[in-house]
Structure formats: structure tokens, C-alpha cells
A protein has these predicted regions:
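Acidic, Ser/Thr- and proline-rich intrinsically disordered linker/docking segments
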Residues: 17-19, 99-155
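Short, surface-exposed beta-strand/loop "edge" segments at domain boundaries and coil↔beta transitions
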Residues: 39, 43-44, 81, 89-90, ...
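Anionic N-terminal interaction surfaces
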Residues: 7, 12, 17-81
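Phosphoinositide-binding peripheral membrane targeting modules
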Residues: 72-80, 85-119
Length: 155
């Protein structure tokens, strides 16, 4: 069994799924759920459903057995992110395959967000410098709140 039983959307989990049903879901089904979670909570950006689902499948495949998907979101440039209790994982579609990048919570010093009339941005102050992630303006505040909570819990 892969990480399927533990890759849960912890907060705002869909009511129609119980624990046993989630444990039986395949990576593709979990990736679709992650995409629709991001879409329904205005955490989506410039990626098609097909591209986002493929990226989420790549992320789910590398997750540890004890990790859960706490916050899946998609940047305005089509990069897919998943925040877990341990780290922030980013997947980017390249010409030949996918590129996965990870940042542990101890590498991120501060998390901010900024909204304008047309777009939102998550700003991560990391040990490597400032990282800006363009997101939907309506979901930036919620995403920032969840990321801060995960960072605080990881201490």
C-alpha cells in the first residue's frame, strides 16, 4: 500500500468520504480530489485540470506514508503545490517530465500574502531568499493562514 491511506485533505475534508474509502483510493483519484479542493477553495491558477492532476500524481508518489495533503494549491503559472506537516512540495511540468522541489518548514522564516484588485501572492521569506508564488486573489489569505499554521505546528 502506498501513501493513499494517509494522503488526506485534513481541513475541510469532503463529507462524502470516510476514512476507509480514502484508504482505498488510487493516486489518480486522490490527485483529482486535490485539484477540485484547490478549485473549490479558490486556490487554483493557470493550469489545466489534466496538467494539474498529473502534477499531483507525481507529488503523491513521492510523499511518505505518514504524510497528509493539508493544502493543495496551484500558482498562476501552473505550478502545483502541496503543503504537508513536514514540507512544502512543488511540481513543475517540464518539456520532458516533471521537476519536484521541496522546502522543509525550518527553511521558511516568514509567510506573508499580498492582494491586489486582480491577483494575489504568497510571499515566503526563506533562508535562500524571498519566494513569491502568484495565486488567486480570493484564496491567498486562506492559503497563507493554513501555511502559517503548518509552519507553527512543525516547530
Amino acid at each position: 500500500m502506498s501513501c493513499l491511506g494517509n494522503c488526506l485533505l485534513k481541513e475541510r475534508e469532503p463529507i462524502m468520504y470516510n476514512q476507509e474509502k480514502i484508504k482505498k483510493m488510487k493516486n489518480h483519484e486522490l490527485a483529482i480530489e486535490a485539484y477540485f479542493y484547490a478549485y473549490n477553495h479558490k486556490l487554483f491558477g493557470g493550469a489545466s485540470q489534466k496538467k494539474a492532476v498529473k502534477c499531483y500524481e507525481q507529488i503523491i508518489a513521492i510523499m511518505d506514508l505518514d504524510e497528509r495533503m493539508n493544502l493543495p494549491f496551484i500558482s498562476t503559472y501552473g505550478r502545483c503545490y502541496v503543503a504537508t506537516e513536514k514540507r512544502l512540495i512543488k511540481c513543475t511540468k517540464k518539456l520532458f517530465g516533471y521537476k519536484i522541489e521541496e522546502q522543509n518548514w525550518n527553511e521558511i522564516k516568514h509567510i506573508f500574502y499580498n492582494n491586489t484588485s486582480s491577483r494575489g501572492a504568497l510571499i515566503l521569506d526563506t533562508v535562500y531568499g524571498e519566494v513569491k508564488i502568484g495565486v488567486h486573489r480570493d484564496g491567498a489569505g486562506y492559503a497563507c493562514e493554513v501555511l502559517r499554521k503548518l509552519k507553527e505546528d512543525a516547530k
